[in-house]
Curated annotation (Swiss-Prot):
Function: Affects the rate of fibrils formation. May have a primary role in collagen fibrillogenesis.
Keyword Glycoprotein: yes
Organism: Rattus norvegicus
Location of Sulfotyrosine modifications: Y20, Y38, Y53, Y55, Y63, Y65
Superkingdom of origin organism: Eukaryota
Protein name (Swiss-Prot/TrEMBL): Fibromodulin
Family per record: Belongs to the small leucine-rich proteoglycan (SLRP) family. SLRP class II subfamily.
Protein keywords: Disulfide bond, Extracellular matrix, Glycoprotein, Leucine-rich repeat, Proteoglycan, Pyrrolidone carboxylic acid, Repeat, Secreted, Signal, Sulfation
Disulfide-bond pairs as recorded: C334-C367
Places the protein is found: Secreted, Extracellular space, Extracellular matrix
Quaternary structure note: Binds to type I and type II collagen.
């Protein structure tokens, strides 16, 4: 009986030792698994450095997850990822999709960018009326393939990305809740007066890199609009009236040749105006066109100006390079030059004109005493 007990103990020890040797490398296998499933929450997304799109899109709260995702819920489309630790987000980007999959009702953030989607069929979002964020940029969507009421039922939608598609018309109707609308890099040719009707909560509108020739008075009712980007279009006239809350206006690379007198008076919060690469002449500008006390930066470079237009003394940065300016008039900056009256201008670019540094009047240092850079 004693010998039997000894043999039994030896067997158990051997078995335990073998099991230990077999499991001693468990941590290596664990690291391999972690390496293959780890998701870096700080990856640039959706615009990576290799991406052809130069404009960044602010990352939404749906990108704030970092742990390796557990198995996906059953109601997530098989073409997409639905991380359980952020259950209201659905990722279907960069998957060569040609159609929009089913959207579960709990979703608030859906990402369909960089696919081959050509249509947004009517009713595709009817099951998820609580959506806040829809990313559809970088697809092949055309205007005639968008359901008439596909967005109007989404009463909580705040951000809509439809840039880098094949749109020829403004989509609509759109929900009043919308705060950001990205329609840049399409082929839109005009903005009808009622195209943005009711969007009183819209704060940013991106329409750059289109083929827009006129916008009429479509911007007047956007009372919350802070940023308007209409650059790289075919505009010959500025919009008829600007929103009162506007702070940033981008109109560079158009064919604008005139700006009405006191045009910016209705936008007392306006800080930045870019009108470079247009067809502006002094005949197309009134005396008080740019005499806005709120303006901090004004870009009029690469136009056809022959004189420096009068600006407000509060202006800090003025870009006039690449024009035909042939004289330096100090009255454009200071109507009266003395110890108490001077311009707050810090940067003045006049290079690439028909003027020499010797043309600066003797009282220029007194008027432009705060300037840190004057390029002639």
């Amino acid at each position: 009986m004693q010998w039997a007990s000894i043999l039994l103990l030896r067997g158990l020890c051997s078995l335990s030792q073998g099991q230990y040797e077999e499991d001693s490398h468990w941590w290596l296998q664990y690291l391999r698994n972690q390496q293959s499933t780890y998701y870096d929450p700080y990856d640039t997304y959706p615009y990576e450095t290799s991406d052809p799109y130069p404009y960044e899109v602010e990352e939404g709260p749906a990108y704030a997850y970092g742990a390796p995702p557990p198995p996906e819920p059953r109601d997530c489309p098989q073409e997409c990822d639905c991380p359980p630790n952020f259950p209201t987000a659905m990722y279907c980007d960069n998957r060569n999709l040609k159609y929009l999959p089913f959207v579960p009702s709990r979703m608030k953030y859906v990402y369909f960018q960089n696919n081959q989607i050509a249509a947004i069929q009517e009713g595709v979002f009817d099951n998820a009326t609580g959506l806040l964020w829809i990313a559809l940029h970088g697809n092949q969507i055309t205007s005639d393939k968008i359901g008439r009421k596909v967005f109007s039922k989404l009463r909580h939608l705040e951000r809509l990305y439809l840039d880098h598609n094949n749109l020829t018309r403004m989509p609509g109707p759109l929900p009043r809740s919308l705060r950001e609308l990205h329609l840049d890099h399409n082929q839109i040719s005009r903005v009808p007066n009622n195209a943005l009707e009711g969007l009183e909560n819209l704060t940013a509108l991106y329409l750059h890199h289109n083929e827009i020739q006129e916008v009429g008075s479509s911007m007047r009712g956007l009372r919350s609009l802070i940023l308007l980007d209409l650059s790289y279009n075919h505009l010959r006239r500025v919009p008829d009236g600007l929103p009162s809350a506007l702070e940033q206006l981008y109109l560079e690379h158009n064919n604008v040749y005139t700006v009405p007198d006191s045009y910016f008076r209705g936008s007392p919060k306006l800080l930045y105006v870019r009108l470079s690469h247009n067809s502006l002449t002094n005949n197309g500008l009134a005396t008080n066109t740019f005499n806005s006390s709120s303006l901090l930066e004004l870009d009029l470079s690469y136009n056809q100006l022959q004189k420096i237009p009068p600006v407000n003394t509060n202006l800090e940065n003025l870009y006039l390079q690449g024009n035909r300016i042939n004289e330096f008039s100090i009255s454009s900056f200071c109507t009266v030059v003395d110890v108490m009256n001077f311009s707050k201008l810090q940067v003045l670019r006049l290079d690439g004109n028909e003027i020499k540094r010797s043309a600066m009047p003797v009282d220029a240092p007194l008027c432009l005493r705060l300037a840190s850079l004057i390029e002639i």
